[in-house]
């Protein structure tokens, strides 16, 4: 009988695994996709919220496309438990057996444990259903309070402003994007947003939310109160692994996987937000809940499920977001306290570069710059490449430290492009260097 591949989760990781399996087996195996919802792209939900695309554009795999890939689709079902000894997955409506299993169940939003956090004026923005609720709720002139100033909050900031709502951001940490950029970069971002009418409350912990006549009143720990028609919680996410308790899989923050994306059971793989796998810079296990990692994980796991032997070098921690025309990014070990640091700032242009070094190896970077500046866009790609390539830059380190705003000579001179080619080719999984040369 043909092997049965069971994929749990229809997001980026799961769909990339399916496509990769089919690239290698030409339809010879059985693939079953289990998903709570019809597959859609979470990363485009902000564009749906802002009215730039219709809801129909958020979906990523049509029934016809999945049928063409010979995928049996079971939507509207949730995974509830796993028996790795019997190769059985327990669902909300029964049990499925498998030969191998990919767990790609993504993340879920986390709300602070405070009074009023579940009130009618309080929303999250993570699922399509939650996006629909906000599309219906936000109107021009609405008073919106965004609780949290991390990456998730910044992905929806533009959409809220595009709807001509009045926006206030409340953040417990003393700066914006506290898990993504440093104090100096955050100060530039704060100044940029204030110029565009965004009210900021950093260093302000939320104590409670009260419902007053269909509106919300937020009480901060320092006693200040804020009125809002809509409150959006953007206070973090965590991997969807709660249903795996007692399964026997090794769990930490996520599902621990090796360099083949294999979990502690030989025929179980994990990919995307739920996988805790190798970090290309540190070599340590980490959860990187970002789209590029989900894509890479899915392709590597899918190749291995199809019988290939593909090793994953590791994912690069990176976050890139654009806020009102300002690009903000960080890569790798951007907060390494023991790293050697080179910094350049042009505050009048809202431009900032920070490079972090271990020896002559670039291990982390922060970038801030206006989107209209072409060199900002170019530098984003080159900083990512220099960090991900992971090789010593030799004499080019001194060049970069002298001129952090001029990356191209070092990127080209150090041969970073050639070193990146064996790591990833157009988003596909790693291939052996001899295969690259042969091509």
Predicted features by range, described:
Residues 1-72, 159-181:
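Beta1-alpha1 glycine-rich phosphate/pyrophosphate-binding loop at the start
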Residues 69-83, 194-206:
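A conserved beta-strand/loop element that lines the FAD pocket in flavoprotein oxidoreductases
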Residues 4, 226-250, 324-409:
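C-terminal catalytic lobe of FAD-dependent flavoproteins
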Residues 105-163:
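Glycine-rich dinucleotide-binding loop and its adjacent helix/turn
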Residues 118-142, 213, 217-219, 224-300:
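FAD-site-proximal beta/loop scaffold in flavoenzymes
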Residues 2-4, 23, 51, 274-375, ...:
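Mid-to-C-terminal Rossmann-like scaffold of FAD/NAD(P)H-dependent oxidoreductases
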Residues 58-59, 143, 151-208, 293-294, ...:
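Rossmann-like dinucleotide-binding cores of NAD(P)H-dependent redox enzymes
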Residues 8, 79, 96-108, 167, ...:
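Short hydrophobic core segments
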């Amino acid at each position: 009988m043909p092997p049965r591949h069971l994929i749990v989760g229809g997001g980026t990781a799961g769909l990339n695994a399916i496509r990769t399996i089919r690239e290698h087996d030409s339809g010879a195996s059985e693939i079953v996709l289990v998903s709570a919802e019809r597959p859609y792209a979470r990363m485009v939900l902000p564009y749906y919220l802002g009215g730039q695309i219709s809801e129909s554009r958020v979906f990523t795999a049509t029934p016809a496309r999945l049928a063409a890939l010979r995928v049996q689709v079971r939507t509207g079902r949730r995974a509830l438990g796993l028996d790795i000894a019997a190769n059985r997955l327990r669902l909300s409506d029964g049990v499925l057996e498998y030969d191998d299993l990919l767990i790609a169940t993504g993340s879920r939003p986390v709300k602070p444990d405070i009074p009023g956090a579940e009130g009618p004026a309080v929303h999250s923005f993570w699922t399509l259903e939650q996006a629909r609720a906000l599309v219906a709720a936000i109107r021009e002139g609405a008073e919106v309070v965004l609780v949290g100033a991390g990456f998730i909050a910044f992905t929806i900031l533009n959409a809220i402003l595009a709807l001509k709502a009045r926006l206030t951001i409340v953040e417990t940490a003393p700066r914006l994007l506290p898990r993504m950029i440093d104090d100096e970069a955050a100060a530039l971002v704060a100044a940029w947003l204030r110029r565009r009418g965004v009210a900021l409350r950093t260093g302000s912990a939320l104590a409670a939310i009260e419902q007053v006549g269909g509106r919300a009143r937020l009480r901060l720990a320092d006693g200040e109160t804020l009125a809002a028609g809509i409150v959006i919680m953007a206070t973090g996410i965590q991997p969807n692994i709660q249903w795996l308790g007692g399964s026997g899989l090794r769990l930490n923050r996520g599902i621990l996987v090796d360099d083949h994306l294999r979990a502690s059971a030989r025929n179980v793989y994990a990919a995307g937000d739920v996988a805790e796998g190798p970090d290309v810079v540190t070599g340590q296990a980490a959860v990187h809940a970002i789209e590029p990692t989900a894509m890479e994980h899915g392709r590597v796991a899918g190749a291995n499920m199809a019988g290939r032997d593909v090793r994953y070098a590791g994912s690069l921690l990176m976050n890139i977001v654009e806020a009102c025309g300002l690009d903000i990014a960080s890569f790798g070990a951007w907060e390494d306290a023991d790293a050697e640091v080179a910094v350049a700032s042009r505050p009048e242009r809202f431009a900032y570069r920070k490079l972090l070094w271990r020896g002559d190896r670039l291990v982390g970077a922060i970038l801030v710059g206006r989107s209209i500046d072409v060199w900002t866009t170019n530098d984003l790609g080159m900083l990512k490449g220099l960090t991900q390539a992971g090789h010593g830059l030799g004499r080019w380190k001194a060049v970069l430290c002298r001129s952090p705003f001029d990356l191209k000579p070092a990127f080209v001179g150090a041969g970073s492009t050639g070193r990146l080619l064996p790591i990833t080719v157009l988003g596909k999984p790693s291939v052996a260097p001899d295969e690259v040369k042969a091509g």
